[in-house]
Every structure is written in C-alpha cells, then in structure tokens.
C-alpha cells in the first residue's frame, strides 16, 4: 500500500479550487440545474439496496475530482492489497482479511503463502454443528435440561457486532433468548444473571487472548454464579464455550477445548462478527441465516472489488463523506436508521469508523495537521431522533451530514405504522435539503389569516436554510443477506477513507494508554491510604472515592 499525502495530489488542489466555485451554489440550485439529478446521483446494489446521494452539495465536477483523488491515492492497489492478504496493518504486521471469513467462493486467500480458507471453513463447520446441538436441545445442562438462554460475554468488537446483528435480525430469531454482557461494571452481569436460570444458560466467552480484563472479570463472575448452583466443577464445561485462541487458559477455566472456536490475528475486533465471534448470531437466527449474512457481505465485497469507481457504492459514499468533512467543514456524521431493529447500527459503526480512522499520525509517522481524518459518528433510530436532536441538524450552526436508512418492507405491518414511518423518512431529507424560505413562512401566516405586521418577530425563527447534505439508503427489506451487504458497504467506506487519509485503519493504539494507567491505579484502590502519586486532579478524585465508598 502506497503512502501518499492526499493534500499533495493534483486532485486535492482541484477540489480546493472547486470548493470556491461551488461556495454560492446550494443543493436547491443543483436540483434546478440538473433535471435528472436523482438518476445521475443514485446507485443500486442487487436490486435490493438503493443509495441516493443526490441531496449533497456536489455536481459532476466534484465527483470527477473526488474520483481522481482516489486514483492518485492508489485506491485500486490498496484494495487488492487487502483482498489478497498483504500485511496492510503494518504497525502490528498483520493482514486484514475479514473478507476471507465470508469468501463464499473458496478462492484461495494466502497469508504468508498459506491458504487460510480451509481453516475458515473448518471453524464454520464446527460452528454449524454446535448450533445444531444447542438449538435442537441435544446439548444438555448439568441437570439434563436443554439450553434456553445464551449470554455472550465480550467487549468492543466481541460485543457490539453480535449484539447489533442479533437485534437487527430479531424477526429471524428462534426460541433461544440472547443476552449480551460487556461492561466491567458489575451491574451489567448482575442484572443479566437475574433474568436467567443456571440449569439452562450457556455462556460464550469471547476473548481472543482469554485475558481481556472486562471479559474475564465478567466470565469469572458468571462461573462463580453457575457453581454456586451446580456445586460441581464439571458443570462449567456444560455451560461455557470459548471464542478464543488460548487453549491453555480456556481449559484451565474449565471449558472443553472441543468447544473453543478459533479466529486469527488477521481478524480485527471491529470486523470480527463474520468469524467465530458471530457464534451468538448463528445461535440466535440459525446457521443457514448466518450463512445468508455472510453471503450478503460477500456480494458487497465482490461489488466493491470489481465495480468501476463511477458505480462503486462504498467508494462513492466514502468520497462524498470526505468532501463533506474536508472541504465543507463537517466534523461529524449521523447515521439515522428508520427501523427499530437497527437501533444499535449507529453504535456499531461508531466503533467501526472512529476506532479505525480516529488517527492523527499518517502512514509515514508524520503528524497530520492540514486535513481531517475520521469524523465523529453517532445516531439514533427515527422517528425518536426527530424529537430529540434533529432541531440542531435543521437549525443549528454545525453542519451534520446524515445517512438515512429505511426498509421498504417492514417485518411488522401494523395498520399504517410503516407508511407513517417512511413519510417521515422522505420528509426529513427533503426538509434538510430544501428548507423553508422567509417568503414561504410569510405566505403560510397570510394563509392562516395573520398579518405580516403581527408575525414579523416570529418569522426568522421559522425559516429553515436547507442545504444540509444527506444520503438516503433504501433497502427492500432487512434480511440476513441485505444486512450483511449493508454492513460490508460501511466497512469498505471506512477503508476507502483510511486509504485516502494515508492512515492505518486497522490498529487501535488509542485504547492502550488508558488501560495501562488503569492497571497502575487498580492496586492503589485496595486500601484506604491516601494517594499522592498522580497529578492533583487524579489524586483528589481517588482520595474522594476512597472516602465515600
């Protein structure tokens, strides 16, 4: 992968000049200028996903310069480097091959000259067998009862992805009840254990190293809880499985290593739901549906790898997003799914994007000070968000580009709920793009029988400037296949931006310092002695904590 500072490219210079040319052009103007704007600025995937990016402040010249930027930053060779197992995570000397986990063609993928696909398929086969035994009731707990509840214990990628997907695909769930524990706050595990029965609960401990502090603390508490009821160490093997590579510690914990599901160092945590980390997904929706999830992602992988840049959905979203942040001044993006099942989608890609591209050092080790890398990602489902934070998106002083996501078909066709939901989905992007002028506000008042003299003081507050950029992503229906494609689409968008930003998107050194300091502080909390080994603020906080506990 080539190291290219994007600001040194001709395309970046062209974009700077183009920004000035477009500075007095609004989205409203662009729709007047281009009669076929929707057709020219929308793309479809598999006749199941429509991506409309027409409500952005871009024209064909913008897109031409952005595509040139991708080419000058060697995007095509970077894509091939990832797909073919090159060690593009250079700070950890690792390949980046979440795409191999969903490689449904079994085309060989080599890491250090070795094809990884036989091992990938072996773990999938093992997962399939395990799911069949649990779902069918063949697997019994320590009293001979079948499993009714599954508790996934993990954190970060070992929690956010599986939790998001199992929630998104609840219409496909079987009889098993799924629970997710991540926070080292004892409240999380305690409240979960109140809901389950030790005789019928299976715990999945998701930690590659089997040493992650939060995960192992929660796993140990779950083990203690089980043994308090079972009073026999042999019960652990009947109620625990591990998603790990540390066979020694897994066995020491009491888990049968036959029920240990491996994954590899070329699988990053935030890209791991496609691996054994997705076992909770497969248990929740059945292995066939898990395979459909993989199939959807694989189809998006093929599209991303082979579609020309003009038709390439992840690349287009990445380039438009980069334009909004680096040239129009946005520092944040909102992901707004109009589907309650997708209520964790924004949180999932908050990690996916911010942990990947939240970097201030480029691939040459230089501090980045003349362009913006990853944006702040956040969001909530519609229509809840409309009654919470949309006010600022519409009338605030901060530019917030938004992705609106909605299914055309609902899993719950109750009365006219879905039409009302989608009417809001369509209305919001229209309102954000076109706004409401002073003249329109005044006309409304006149129609309501008011005189302009009476309302002149209120008119400014009811004006909407519009010109707020949005993407509309319409999905035919949220299924395992389309969800897999949607997730992969966002993964590749993040990758493209990381390539152009000239950063390493697949490490996360930013999480390490806090961990190191916490390990230093933990022993200081075991007694009541005052501490003086930190700065005055940290000392004061620790000492007050000791006084109050």
Curated annotation (Swiss-Prot):
| Catalytic center residues | 355 (proton donor), 387, 515
Give the main location: cytoplasm
**GO molecular-function term, one example from the UniProt record:** carbohydrate derivative binding
| EC numbers on record | 5.3.1.9
Q: Is Transmembrane helix found in the keyword set?
A: no
* Matches recorded under InterPro entries: G6P_Isomerase (IPR001672), G6P_Isomerase_C (IPR023096), Phosphoglucose_isomerase_CS (IPR018189), SIS_dom_sf (IPR046348), SIS_PGI_1 (IPR035476), SIS_PGI_2 (IPR035482)
**CDD domains in UniProt:** SIS_PGI_1 (cd05015), SIS_PGI_2 (cd05016)
Keyword entries, A-Z: Cytoplasm, Gluconeogenesis, Glycolysis, Isomerase
Recorded metabolic or biological pathway in which this protein acts: Carbohydrate biosynthesis; gluconeogenesis; Carbohydrate degradation; glycolysis; D-glyceraldehyde 3-phosphate and glycerone phosphate from D-glucose: step 2/4
Q: What superkingdom heads the lineage?
A: Bacteria
Catalyzed reaction equations: alpha-D-glucose 6-phosphate = beta-D-fructose 6-phosphate
Q: Give a short account of what the protein does.
A: Catalyzes the reversible isomerization of glucose-6-phosphate to fructose-6-phosphate.
Family, per entry = Belongs to the GPI family.
The protein, known as: Glucose-6-phosphate isomerase
**What species was this sequence derived from?**
Haemophilus influenzae (strain PittEE)
